Amino acid sequence: MRRQLLPALTMLLVFTVITGIVYPLAVTGVGQLFFGDQANGALLERDGQVIGSAHIGQQFTAAKYFHPRPSSAGDGYDAAASSGSNLGPTNEKLLAAVAERVTAYRKENNLPADTLVPVDAVTGSGSGLDPAISVVNAKLQAPRVAQARNISIRQVERLIEDHTDARGLGFLGERAVNVLRLNLALDRL
């Protein structure tokens, strides 16, 4: 029995050290070395105060700010309740909520009734915490933001261009605008 127990305990100890100490330290080291900002949460500051993360959406409702995607994550982008709605595409509750959001989006942005509304403006993301909106969504909100801040639409469009992220690896997904970064840039004007 001792002949079998000693190798088993040795392997348990070796793999505990590898998977419990060596591997986590290596991953943390690589993350800090090559992706320090992301590994530390991509925290954004204003006046030396941390106000959020570039990776987690925040609720903005004032007319002078760009509005994020709708969130199913509790009240106002509650990270502790992160999730999508889990309602299927034919669910009556989801369809009614999307129709209501389309009407509200057109109204708050003074858009004609026949304006196509970007899907990201009326549907939540899988996590419910998506920090970005599409470029089309941002451009449709730009006139409202410019009017509320009493600045030119061109200034707002320039900020949108400056804060548009490229596609992942240059070809994956769509270009997107980080709402928190864009709103912080607006506040700096």
Curated annotation (Swiss-Prot):
Protein name (record): Potassium-transporting ATPase KdpC subunit
Superkingdom of source: Bacteria
NCBIfam families: kdpC, PRK00315.1, PRK14001.1
Described function: Part of the high-affinity ATP-driven potassium transport (or Kdp) system, which catalyzes the hydrolysis of ATP coupled with the electrogenic transport of potassium into the cytoplasm. This subunit acts as a catalytic chaperone that increases the ATP-binding affinity of the ATP-hydrolyzing subunit KdpB by the formation of a transient KdpB/KdpC/ATP ternary complex.
Annotated transmembrane regions: 5-25
Quaternary assembly: The system is composed of three essential subunits: KdpA, KdpB and KdpC.
PANTHER family linked: POTASSIUM-TRANSPORTING ATPASE C CHAIN, POTASSIUM-TRANSPORTING ATPASE KDPC SUBUNIT
Keywords: ATP-binding, Cell membrane, Ion transport, Membrane, Nucleotide-binding, Potassium, Potassium transport, Transmembrane, Transmembrane helix, Transport
Keyword check for Membrane: yes
Cellular compartment(s): Cell membrane
Lineage: Bacteria, Bacillati, Actinomycetota, Actinomycetes, Mycobacteriales
One example GO MF annotation: P-type potassium transmembrane transporter activity
Gene Ontology annotations for the cellular component aspect, listed alphabetically: plasma membrane
GO terms (BP aspect): potassium ion transmembrane transport
Organism: Mycobacterium tuberculosis (strain ATCC 25618 / H37Rv)
UniProt family annotation: Belongs to the KdpC family.
Membrane-topology descriptor: Single-pass membrane protein
